[in-house]
Amino acid sequence: MPRPKPDDRSDNVEKLQDMVQNTIENIEKAEETMQFASPEERERIREKNRRREEAIAAMRAEIKDEAAAREHGYQ
């Protein structure tokens, strides 16, 4: 039976930062499309962007945790 690969957290901070940037870009694109959307679609976009903002906050907290773990050698 093959052994599982060890947990490689060495690039987690960078991956999370990319995810934050992509999410910010998605928010901006969604806001641009709102001018062409119906009132119902605008409300759905607003709700989705609120969830995206919450996700960004969680990812930023995870970035801090991962950066601290990196400094302490992932103990």
Curated annotation (Swiss-Prot):
Annotated keywords: Sporulation
Domain of life: Bacteria
Induction conditions: Expressed only in the forespore compartment of sporulating cells.
Transmembrane segments: none
InterPro entries, A to Z: SASP_thioredoxin-like
Pfam families, A to Z: Tlp
Keyword S-adenosyl-L-methionine attributed: no
Location in the cell: Spore core
Family designation: Belongs to the Tlp family.
The protein's name in its UniProt record: Small, acid-soluble spore protein Tlp
Origin species: Geobacillus thermodenitrificans (strain NG80-2)
Lineage: Bacteria, Bacillati, Bacillota, Bacilli, Bacillales
